[in-house]
Amino acid sequence: RYIGSPKVKETDRIRGFSEAEMEQMDRTGIVKDVRDNTIFLTFDDWGTDASINHLLYVLRKHHAKGTFFIITWNVKNNPNLLRAIAEDGHDIASHTNRHRPMVWQTSNYGGNMTPMTEEEYAEDVRLSYEELQKTVGDVMVDGKPALTHYFRPPTLAISKSGIRSIMDAGFSY
């Protein structure tokens, strides 16, 4: 299920979908079936050890939980930090392995990177989940796995072939 924003109709943010398919997408950004007054805290990418540890301290202090969308290329530098995030009770989700965009926009990264093929993107998504599984796949929090099947695309832009890669890899959101 795609949960997006009103910007999903901008042609440089979405590729390969027909008008009818785009009309069926949830562009409200609202997650259904949650309690009133629920706030979702989500964190993308990866930071320094110091910044992540400070963030974990603040979340612990306020008894708050979040979802961390992880660029797994960075996990190799400190897998124990990812385990600490999971063991603190936060959901772990994928933000790809290399943070390469699914849809190429001229504004992405100043145009310094080349887009990936559909096969390369599928491999990047697969590698991302594999690294997360290897690092935190055994962590359980309150009886449920810390590792989720959530995915957030870099730059939040999507394409039909990218969505196919994500769903084929077993992601649900």
Walk through the language-model features, giving the residues of each.
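His/Asp/Glu-enriched short active-site or ligand-binding loop at hydrolase and phosphoryl-transfer sites
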Residues: G162-Y173
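Surface-exposed acidic loop/strand-edge motifs in secreted or periplasmic proteins
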Residues: E120
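Active-site beta->alpha N-cap acidic-glycine motif
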Residues: Y2-M116, L127-H149
